[in-house]
Amino acid sequence: MSNSCSTSSYPIRRKTPTRSGSNVNRNYVPSTYRPSICQCNQSNQSNQYNRSCHQTLPWYNKSNKPSFLDYKVNGSHSARKTCPSIPAKYHSPYTQCSGKCCC
């Protein structure tokens, strides 16, 4: 079965981070990262999506540090190759996972 996401060239929200450490915008994505973005169909979120991929775009943790690790809902970090649900406050809803889409 195909997964529930479609690849599209959706623009990444880019905002320049502020210099005051604690106010770095969590939606900031370095301009050098311009991969194809996956737009998920949230209403079809199920086991259909690819569980073997891992996110390749950075998300920002509570310390405003960019990280390429996967995000776990319980707040801990992991480099395991899964497609976690990434809260909007940490990351744009559009992510790319090793060339495949995940929700």
UniProtKB/Swiss-Prot annotation:
Residue ranges with Polar residues bias: 1-10, 18-28
Region (Disordered) residue spans: 1-28
Record-given protein name: Uncharacterized protein L586
